[in-house]
């Protein structure tokens, strides 16, 4: 989750139980299962509040297959491991060595924050081992652009074609691409178009009452 929405939850435990975030964990589990190996080295770009890393260490059914996790985020101020990651082979930094190679890269809701998105994709490709896998999620459809995108610092939204073309241009082979949460599209469309939003809002992800 983006650090801008960090104050919307009281704890990491509360955050990882949000239905939106839990759904994303399914895709993380799926890519590890697809990779089908042990001693996996994972890099997460834009790790933010680290909910994905928390899941990988504490809740994923594939935790035993993971050798190391590196969380990268230029906005991280505290690079020490949190309590829940003290005994794990997990590290945090603001940038990654250009020589490091990963089996799996996670970049979930990250690409839209980068103006030169094609450059970022090439960098991520170069970080992957030859048989490595990259999991990307991005906000969909430019016509759903709203003040929430501005609040989060987005440059654009994508559709399947634009993301597919961008990935191929970066030298990546696309294995699977599809829309997540498509069942809420009509509601999101109406909310974006009918309700005014304050650009200083603290985000869409909030804890349940």
Model-identified regions with their sequence ranges:
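Conserved N-terminal segment of class I S-adenosyl-L-methionine
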Residues: 1-100, 104, 108, 118-121
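A C-terminal cap/extension of S-adenosyl-L-methionine-dependent methyltransferases
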Residues: 3-4, 13-17, 92, 184-209
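Short, glycine-/aromatic-enriched active-site segment of Class I SAM-dependent methyltransferases
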Residues: 11-12, 135-156, 162-165
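Short conserved AdoMet
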Residues: 37, 115, 129
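A short His-aromatic
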Residues: 109-113
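A short glycine-rich, Lys/Arg-flanked "PGG" loop and its adjoining helix->strand segment in the class I
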Residues: 118-133
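Conserved S-adenosyl-L-methionine
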Residues: 172-182
């Amino acid at each position: 989750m983006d650090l801008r929405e960090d104050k919307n939850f009281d704890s990491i435990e509360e955050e990882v139980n949000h239905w939106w975030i839990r759904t994303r964990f399914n895709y993380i589990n799926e890519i590890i299962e697809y990779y089908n190996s042990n001693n996996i080295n994972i890099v997460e770009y834009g790790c933010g509040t680290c909910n994905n890393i928390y899941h990988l260490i504490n809740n994923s059914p594939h935790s035993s297959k993971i050798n190391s996790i590196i969380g990268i985020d230029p906005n991280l101020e505290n690079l020490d491991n949190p309590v829940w990651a003290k005994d794990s082979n997990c590290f945090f930094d603001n940038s990654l060595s250009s020589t490091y190679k990963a089996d799996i890269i996670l970049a979930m809701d990250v690409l839209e924050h980068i103006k030169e998105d094609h450059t970022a994709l090439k960098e991520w490709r170069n970080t992957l081992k030859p048989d490595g896998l990259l999991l990307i999620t991005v906000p969909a459809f430019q016509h759903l652009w709203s003040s929430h995108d501005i609040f989060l610092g987005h440059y654009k939204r994508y559709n399947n074609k634009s993301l597919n073309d961008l990935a191929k241009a970066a030298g990546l082979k696309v294995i699977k691409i599809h829309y997540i949460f498509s069942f809420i599209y009509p509601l999101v469309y109406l909310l974006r178009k009918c309700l005014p939003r304050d650009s200083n809002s603290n985000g869409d992800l909030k804890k349940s009452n």
